[in-house]
Amino acid sequence: MKRPDYRTLQALDAVIRERGFERAAQKLCITQSAVSQRIKQLENMFGQPLLVRTVPPRPTEQGQKLLALLRQVELLEEEWLGDEQTGSTPLLLSLAVNADSLATWLLPALANVLSDSPIRLNLQVEDETRTQERLRRGEVVGAVSIQPQALPSCLVDQLGALDYLFVASKEFAQRYFPNGVTRSALLKAPVVAFDHLDDMHQAFLQQNFDLPPGSVPCHIVNSSEAFVQLARQGTTCCMIPHLQIEKELNSGELIDLTPGLFQRRMLYWHRFAPESRMMRRVTDALIDYGHKVLRQD
């Protein structure tokens, strides 16, 4: 069995993290030539390329597997060192999460773990349809995803669902939907998406109003909190998690434009196996809190 030298693996990791050989060399305090030599040594060991030398570089499938292995080893090693050394550097946990979970339930779920454990979070925000890919590539050690199937050598548990409502302010509804929400009225009503890959509102409008993708005016805003602000100020109608706007709905500041119609996103927690003790604490916290505040039916 081929056993990689973790010093050479760290060179591969640095090139991916720093998005290039020059910055990787600066990060590792070695020359650019030394970085290239270490990666070539790894590639010779495994008999195949580990990097696609694009700008920025990206790992091959085998490179992704090695980076995932490095994440597991680093996590277990740092936890062990934490047991052996007092005052050691807090354990770094890199997690991939979707913006809506971050804006609603995830931080409260981790509050106790963060307050009484020596850890540092590195939260990487990504759409819930793509967070699992970050775990596959070895960029993170855990991911909140809509994918129900675990990756090889990983574990998965169901967290619960976020229900997304199609909402707007009363003023917006009066302006764009004086006769109710109809297909023709929707063609003129601006919506908002998180990025160009966010198709939630498109799927909702196509499923319920037979509107093809791209048929309504759409803003692009990379912020869950900004969705709420845009809806409150009457700029757009939005797909927003019910959990995020309970107060606004109860006060009447926002209204559900299509009562009884919603988009449900079931969320799952993925992480490497075996779990370290600290990751087990994170897992328990996310599952316990998720089962309390997310839809379970």
UniProtKB/Swiss-Prot annotation:
Classify the source by domain of life.
Bacteria
Q: HTH lysR-type domain location, by residue?
A: 4-60
NCBIfam families given in the database record: argP, PRK03635.1, PRK13348.1
Assembly notes: Homodimer.
Q: Which family does it belong to?
A: Belongs to the LysR transcriptional regulatory family.
Give the protein's recorded name.
Answer: HTH-type transcriptional regulator ArgP
InterPro entries assigned: ArgP, ArgP_gammaproteobact, LTTR, LysR_subst-bd, Tscrpt_reg_HTH_LysR, WH-like_DNA-bd_sf, WH_DNA-bd_sf
* The species this protein was found in: Klebsiella pneumoniae subsp. pneumoniae (strain ATCC 700721 / MGH 78578)
Q: Which residues bind DNA?
A: 21-40
**Lineage of origin:** Bacteria, Pseudomonadati, Pseudomonadota, Gammaproteobacteria, Enterobacterales
Query: Which Gene Ontology molecular-function terms are recorded?
Result: DNA binding; DNA-binding transcription factor activity
Q: Which UniProt keywords apply?
A: DNA-binding, Transcription, Transcription regulation
- An example Pfam family from this entry, by short name, is LysR_substrate
Q: Describe the task this protein carries out.
A: Controls the transcription of genes involved in arginine and lysine metabolism.
Task: Report the Gene3D superfamilies cross-referenced here.
Answer: 3.40.190.290, Winged helix-like DNA-binding domain superfamily/Winged helix DNA-binding domain (1.10.10.10)
